[in-house]
Amino acid sequence: MSQQTTIRKLAELVNTPVDKLLVQLAEAGMKFSGPDQVVTSTEKMKLLGFLRRTHGKAETSAEAASEAAKKITLNRRKLQEVTVNAGRTKTTVNVEVRQKRTYVKSENEGGGRAAPMTPDEERADILRKLEESRQRNLEEQQRLAESDRVRDEAIQRKREEEQAAKDRAEAERKAAEEAAAAASAPAPVADAPKPSAAAPAARLPSSPSSAPRAARPAGASPASRPAAPARADDRSNAAKHKTRGSHVMVAGVEDDDATKRFAGQLHLSAADRARRSNVRGKPTGRPGSSSSRRGNDSGRGGSQANSGPHGFERPTAPVVREVAIGETITVADLAQKLALKGGDVVKALFKMGVMATITQSIDHDTAALVTEELGHKAVRADNADFEDALLAHAEDAQGEATSRPPVVTIMGHVDHGKTSLLDYIRRTKIASGEAGGITQHIGAYHVETGRGVISFLDTPGHAAFTSMRARGAKITDIVVLVVAADDGVMPQTKEAVAHAKAAGVPLIVAVNKIDKTGADPLRVKNELLAENVVAEEFGGDTQFIEVSAKLGTGVDTLLDAISLQAEVLELKAVAEGRASGTVIESSLDKGRGPVATVLVQQGALKRGDYLVCGIQYGRVRALFDETGHQPASAGPSIPVQVLGLSGVPEAGDDFVVVDDERLAKDVAQQRETKRRESRLVASATNRMEDILAQMGKGEGQQVLNLVIKADVQGSVEALKQSLVALSNEDIRINVIHSGVGGITESDANSAAASKATIIGFNVRADASARKIVESNGIDLRYFSIIYDVIDQVKQVASGLLGVEIREEIIGIAQVRDVFRSSKFGAVAGCMVIEGVVKRSKPIRVLRDSVVVFEGELESLRRFKENVDEVRNGTECGIGVKAYNDVKAGDQIECFERIEVARTL
């Protein structure tokens, strides 16, 4: 190669485009203006060295050794943990990351370079390298072409095999339909063909390594199957692409039926279900059936159900369940009845806006709504098994009904003489023994008169005892409404009329206190006309009897009216058998335990009977009447006190006598469970509402916690209703605990934990409770009159409200002129036109009746002297602090802020 080699000539020799060669020369640090310039041998060697360095190769063997000495390679290994999904679970896999990095020593730091090659050696070396590069490119192109050809052939072969599999599946389906039709046709037993000798040969062995099926549908020739090499290739492809689910290999043989099963056919025809059960079941030997085929489920270790009426079939339509739901049900139990996960039911409740946990109880309405939301049907469950048993007992007690005494309830306003009238009838002094002279619980008595036995219920007249009066009207036969002739109709009088009408019982009006000078019975009749109570003399049907409980005037006439009304009603009841009735009042007596005052309405109550009373039960240990005697039994319309119950029953609960203690205990426990669940559901439902309400109210609302203990259940109920009703948006009365009986140690601990006030109504605290009260500084208060309880709780609640700041205007001054002062700035010359202006009070500046400034007085002078106040009709000078825009005609309003105690 001559020294006059141009760039164009060199490009032809190395088979490289001229432009590319110019770029490479430029990258090697040699600048040429055109392809006709001459390239020297030194420049060629420099280009070759650049290209070798670019491709990571040494220029010569000596250079290679030198390059190796200039390089250092560092290997780094790093262990990591990667979490991958494996079905429903997650698996942690250890991964090792290897990094390799090579560092090359700079050329400036190296030694001298090797001797340059001769031009002939350089040319031969370049040609050899170019030839090797062309050979490698050619081999790579051939390899890619061969790979494309093999891939195309595999795709084509796969399509042909899939088409052949579809054809075979269609033929098998038709054969299965024909076999199912033949099997469904009735045939005599005598005509059943025997299995032929060739039948076993047609069946496939049960071994997994057996050959493919021998039995093939008509029309499927052996030529349609692929060749053995294609099978091998197909198996390799299936192994590589098994995630696609195109083919399934069983014991080294392609299983088309398995492929079809994994394709996910959910809705199957009758023929498909018959064919599938035949494939999975054992051979039956019936000619024409496809049961001779191999079952592919042996690998899972369990045998499948045989075809027939008892075989399992996948449901093809949504299953709608009928779920029985009681009054309450837990989320877990509801999910079990719906055959769902508990989390799914909780999610459905969240979507409906109900925040519940899987163990929480929900009411029937909520459970029914979520059941309908999930696509099922909810029905109300009948949980009254024990209640039905009680009804059966009550029906067994039915016998011949005989006349019974009337039950008369005395109702009316407070201090109208109800108890005094009853005292005169009974010839006792009950009213004198009442605290404050007012009745605070229902009293039950029966009186033997010349006209027969009459049972009386004395109800409280105070507004707090509304529920007591309603309970008395519910169990009564006749209501005697006592109205004071000198006082007329009062609020509780109207309420008693409403209770009597709601209960549907006749009303007799006793106009009391007619012996007083201001008595006006006609006024009472006219006022009751507004309540639709019309006297007989006005054309109505209500008897008005004028009586005097003090003198006894008209009492006999009243008893005659009661007896007449009872005869009209024809009151009857069964006097024998198991007793039933209603609890009028209950209490907890020291030494006697729970005591319940009951009114027998059916049957006869005897000592030793097993009693169920609400959620309480027990055996009757003793019976007491209102005089303290112990009768042997109590018949209909007779009130008695019962001892022996397991706890204090609620006033108004019904009681019934049962045969044995076991039934009584079961019924009481079931009622208690239902009541507790209902209470939990109510508290859980209101919990979030209370939280949101507290968030909305913030810190503005005060809370007064109370612990209430009383002598009887009715008083507890009345106190709770009256005190909770005092709550408003500023203060909330919260009764954290209430009960019947004395104040115990647990009551004191509850009050100490919640910083509550203990209210004892006709009860006292024991020694241990008093010790806790003293050590913790608990507020303990005793009461015997309900008026005092309400008044004192109002005072305590008002003290929690704090004080209210009010502004009161004390004086107004009219600005007549404005003066300038070097010390105070603008000084207003004013005339006090109203009240008094004081220096220490805040002021407002009004302009055209609009407040333009609010601040305080800086200076108040009269005749250049500082004064504390200026009264009406006096001139003065007023300096307003930090305000210099006072103008003539403005008004300066002086006011003071006062604190006013807030009340309920």
UniProtKB/Swiss-Prot annotation:
tr-type G domain segment(s): 403-572
Pfam families in alphabetical order: EF-G_D2, GTP_EFTU, GTP_EFTU_D2, IF-2, IF2_assoc, IF2_N
GO cellular component terms listed in the entry, alphabetical order: cytosol
Subcellular compartments: Cytoplasm
Disulfide cysteine pairs (residue numbers): none
Region called G2, residue ranges: 437-441
Organism superkingdom: Bacteria
Chain intervals for the UniProt region annotation (G3): 458-461
SUPFAM superfamilies registered for this protein in UniProt: Initiation factor IF2/eIF5b, domain 3, P-loop containing nucleoside triphosphate hydrolases, Putative DNA-binding domain, Translation proteins
Chain residues that bind GTP: 412-419, 458-462, 512-515
Chain residue ranges for the region called G1: 412-419
Keywords (A to Z) from UniProt: Cytoplasm, GTP-binding, Initiation factor, Nucleotide-binding, Protein biosynthesis
Ranges where the record places region Disordered: 102-122, 134-252, 267-316
Compositional bias ranges of the Low complexity kind: 178-230
InterPro entries, sorted: DNA-bd_dom_put_sf, EF-G-like_DII, EFTu-like_2, IF2_assoc_dom_bac, IF2_II, IF2_N, P-loop_NTPase, Small_GTP-bd
UniProt biased composition (Basic and acidic residues): 134-177
Region named G5: 548-550
GO molecular function, one term: guanosine tetraphosphate binding
Chain segments carrying region G4: 512-515
UniProt similarity note: Belongs to the TRAFAC class translation factor GTPase superfamily. Classic translation factor GTPase family. IF-2 subfamily.
Role played: One of the essential components for the initiation of protein synthesis. Protects formylmethionyl-tRNA from spontaneous hydrolysis and promotes its binding to the 30S ribosomal subunits. Also involved in the hydrolysis of GTP during the formation of the 70S ribosomal complex.
HAMAP family documented for this protein: IF_2_B
Protein's name in the database: Translation initiation factor IF-2
Gene it is expressed from: infB
